[in-house]
Amino acid sequence: MIHCGICGKAKTADVQFICCHCINGSPAVLLRDKMNLLILRQEVEQLKTAVEDQLETGFAGEGQLGRQLQKLDIYNEKRRLIKLRQRLQLARNKVQLKRNKYNELLQIMSTNGYLEESTSATDSIDLEEQAAEESASLDTLSHILARNQKQLFAELCRWFRIRKSDEDDVFSYTIWGLPMVNLKNGSELDPSIMVSSMRYLQQYLQLAFRIWLFKAICDKPIENDRNIIENFTQLIYDTLDILRARKLVSKSVSIRDILIRYDLDGMIYHLSQNKYLSSLDDASNSYPPTMQNIKQLVMSMIPSI
């Protein structure tokens, strides 16, 4: 049998017990319990503040949660673009079928003179109207696709935090807060930072290709700093490929001149800003931007390797 520790009143529960009358009539007991309650509330508020800070940091994009959510948004948007592209292709096929049918009917009407002119004219007008409607629908889908691509690519650039740095004279651009590697000064970076920077660039280019060109590029992961030449070669080749597809460089661009003027980091930054890169042209196409030619340039521009 449990009794009150002050008045001795019986209590059957197997817990430490003080009756309500004694709590209210004993200042020492009441003060102790109130102090415990205040301490408990303070601890709860501290835990609540810590949880809110963690959630705010995570959803703001600085923590792991924010990164995963942003990555999920990009992949969801990419799926929407793929579906939109499929709808666009179906609309194009439908328009082409209408045009083929229209041409076939025109040929039949021209070879069979017994068809009445009124019927031929009516059929021709109907087919032209259908073709015009399908073309308008195709144009609408094309505009929607282009707009969504621009929005998704802008979000991609914000996610990777590609920025120009005015404080560093050696590395003018950053990605995810790290110096963006370049041919001129890449050897000055710590090997681990260089590899991390290259990995971010590779991930950025992979997603950019899927947004603009709906195709994947070389997904061989960059694991260490032993194949620096191959890593630089692949990154430069992919960057030039998407720059040419986006018409941000001349079709006959001189790869030597553009690397001297902008280097890899400058090319990536101009791509993120959708800015045209002016350079000399290789009109004779004597040095096309192939993997082998780019590799030779990389080897000549990094004398320390």
Curated annotation (Swiss-Prot):
Deletion consequences: Still forms preautophagosomal structures (PAS) in proximity to the vacuolar membrane.
Coiled-coil annotated spans: 34-147
InterPro entries: Autophagy-related_protein_14, UV_resistance/autophagy_Atg14
Annotated compartments: Preautophagosomal structure membrane; Vacuole membrane
S-S pairs: none
GO cellular component, as recorded: phagophore assembly site membrane; protein-containing complex; vacuolar membrane
Domain of life of the organism encoding this protein: Eukaryota
Main location, first listed in the record: membrane
Pfam families reported for this sequence: ATG14
UniProt topology in membrane: Peripheral membrane protein
Entry comment, domain topic: Coiled-Coils at the N-terminal half are essential for autophagy.
More about this protein: Kluyveromyces marxianus proteins are shorter in length and have a more ordered secondary structure than their S.cerevisiae counterparts, which might contribute to the superior thermotolerance and solubility. K.marxianus could be therefore useful as a new model organism for further elucidation of the molecular details of autophagy.
The protein's assembly and partners: Component of the autophagy-specific VPS34 PI3-kinase complex I.
Name of the protein this chain belongs to: Autophagy-related protein 14
Organism: Kluyveromyces marxianus (strain DMKU3-1042 / BCC 29191 / NBRC 104275)
